[in-house]
Amino acid sequence: NGDISAWDVSNVTRMGEMFSGATSFNQDLSNWDVSNVTDMRGMFLGATAFNGDISAWDVSRVTDMSYIFFNAESFNQDIGGWDVSNVVDSSSFDSGALNWQDDYKPNFQ
């Protein structure tokens, strides 16, 4: 795995399934500017080793977070501060994320 922490993703709008099935992926994405992303569907689906701090991400434009952490077994970061007010699909958002504490999850209205 090459270092992708400095990638410029500021113009990306769709990150759906970006790391889907990447079972050994656990890189630092904390500095990524995802403020233009609208689709994060299945982004970390099956990324069983991922537990990166993405709490500072601006996800306020995201509308689809379905399956984003589906079977992301190691994920246990506090993203409770995420603005998910524009999310219209959060189905199976965290199914199978076995180690994730409920109070770390965003509050979908």
Spans of model-derived segments:
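Negatively charged
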Residues: 1-109
